Amino acid sequence: VFNPNSGKAQLKNSLMKIIQIFSNADYEVTVYPTKAALDGYEKIKAAKGLYDIIVCSGGDGTLNEVVSAVITYGDEKVPIGYIPSGSTNDFAKSLGIPSDKIRAAYNVVSGESFSCDIGIINDRRYFNYVAAFGAFTDVAYETPQDLKNMFGHQAYVIEGAKRLLNLKAYKMKVTSSRLDIEDNFIYG
């Protein structure tokens, strides 16, 4: 499952080589390009039980769709390989997954599997990287793909900066064993 629009749409330059890496490792490869948000989720839902491994390439959002579908539809034992091709690939960086797509593909076919924590919110929404709230939490989702393709990580900074003029402060009281504070705060 891959998102052909993620990052700067550079996966297309490596896709045939990646397929060859899996084919040379005796994997029977099925390739599915996503067409819209949650498309990868639906594809994995429909393919429950058909694959021994699921590999995805895209950004953090594509990976989250795949992880959520695998867990939701009862295929938790199926390993997930990840070839990062998003704008920032924060999750991959945090786990030491190579940013080079070819190295990441070799890593999937020859690397050791590992477990990572998956969280769930309200018994229905899984997350593998970040669960957040505050003034800028929608920036990653609201940043237009064409901006991400053009500017990479800086697109998020631009989108976040647009929100600065609309920030609202909320009167709050924070109490802990070490301090009591009452003031106006901005969720950020």
Positions of the model-derived regions?
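Short Gly/Thr/Asp-enriched flexible loops that form oxyanion-binding sites at enzyme active sites
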Residues: 62-75
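Short amphipathic alpha-helical segments
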Residues: 12-14, 67-70, 93-95
